[in-house]
């Protein structure tokens, strides 16, 4: 009898909460997971980072917190998720994921009327980790190229991945932009590559070194100029790069390290403003602190 009374009291409290939410024009009994799915269908496709956000949110949907009603998700729930997530990934990854989760609650509050207050209020973001400073040495590059078949052919994914690595070190282009580079956006006469839409939301033109041009000319001969220059999807490039670096015993490398290497090399040839134009950085401090990684021994030689 006592248990029945407790159940009735709990049910009554839930019903009161529903009535209260409805009186405020909010929608009770909506699962957090359903709101996330609506966001995936309506908001995520409008973003340039659609693919990455889709993967992030589908992973998040496997977490028990998404089984709660969105109106019941608390700040403590989010803080517990942060602590749990930090056990398996770096703080930068958690900060990115929190940005998306925070926007879901913002849309749920301001546009869809699911909640009257966001549980993200007062949430402390994990501290930013130190910027990565790893560069790609000639030894690293040679070790990967040596096992890639690049010297003999460009008809395999391994060989074209090696070509992309070499091209990245020459141009400072990101992996995604290399994979999407089309022949129509390459000007061999002016030695430039036009990138119509970049990470910062603008287009830019990248100058091409003689080595970069040589890579493209070889691709044109061996692969043809009917499709994209490197004829490789981003997902395939990523998977193949992981295999190659493991075989070459260079698992500590990230493809993005080639961008830092390229910009450090280019900094010896052009001024910082030109370097920012090449890289697409609007904030010079980010360029200097994150991507420019000079060898101080080389700098010392320049001082003599």
From Swiss-Prot:
Keywords: DNA integration, DNA recombination, DNA-binding, Viral genome integration, Virus entry into host cell. Pfam families: Phage_integrase. InterPro entries: CB, DNA_brk_join_enz, Integrase-like_cat_sf, Integrase_catalytic, Integrase_recombinase_N, Tyrosine_recombinase_XerCD. Residues 131-304 form the Tyr recombinase domain. PANTHER family: INTEGRASE_RECOMBINASE HI_1414-RELATED (PTHR30349:SF94), PHAGE INTEGRASE-RELATED (PTHR30349). The keyword DNA-binding applies. CDD domains: INT_Rci_Hp1_C (cd00796). This is Putative integrase/recombinase HI_1414. One of its GO terms (molecular function) is DNA binding. One of its GO terms (biological process) is DNA recombination. The keyword DNA-binding applies. It comes from the Bacteria. It comes from Haemophilus influenzae (strain ATCC 51907 / DSM 11121 / KW20 / Rd). The active site is at residues 174, 199, 256, 259, 281, 291. Belongs to the 'phage' integrase family. PROSITE patterns: CB (PS51900), TYR_RECOMBINASE (PS51898). Residues 30-109 form the Core-binding (CB) domain.
């Amino acid at each position: 009898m006592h248990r029945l009374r407790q159940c009735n009291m709990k049910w009554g409290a839930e019903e009161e909460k529903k009535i209260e939410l409805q009186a405020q024009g909010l929608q009770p009994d909506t699962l957090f997971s359903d709101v996330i799915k609506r966001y995936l269908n309506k908001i995520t496709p409008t973003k340039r980072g659609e693919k990455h956000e889709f993967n992030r949110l589908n992973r998040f949907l496997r977490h028990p917190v998404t089984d709660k009603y969105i109106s019941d998700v608390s700040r403590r729930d989010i803080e517990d998720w942060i602590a749990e997530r930090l056990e398996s990934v770096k703080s930068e990854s958690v900060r990115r994921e929190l940005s998306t989760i925070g926007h879901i609650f913002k849309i749920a509050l301001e546009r869809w009327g699911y909640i009257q207050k966001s549980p993200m209020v007062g949430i402390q973001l994990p501290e930013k980790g130190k910027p990565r400073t790893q560069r790609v040495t000639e030894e690293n590059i040679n070790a990967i190229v040596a096992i890639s078949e690049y010297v003999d052919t460009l008809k395999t994914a391994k060989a074209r991945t090696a070509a992309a690595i070499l091209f990245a070190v020459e141009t400072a282009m990101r992996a995604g932009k290399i994979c999407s580079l089309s022949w129509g956006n390459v000007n061999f006469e002016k030695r430039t590559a036009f990138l119509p839409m970049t990470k910062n939301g603008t287009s830019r033109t990248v100058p091409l070194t003689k080595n970069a041009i040589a890579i493209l000319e070889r691709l044109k001969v061996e692969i043809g100029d009917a499709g994209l220059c490197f004829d490789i999807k981003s997902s395939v490039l990523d998977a193949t790069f992981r295999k190659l670096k493991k075989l070459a015993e260079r698992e500590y490398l990230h493809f993005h390290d080639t961008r830092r290497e390229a910009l450090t090399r280019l900094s010896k040839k052009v001024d910082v403003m030109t370097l920012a134009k090449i890289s697409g950085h609007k904030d010079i401090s980010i360029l200097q602190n994150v991507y420019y990684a000079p060898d101080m021994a080389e700098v010392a030689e320049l001082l003599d």
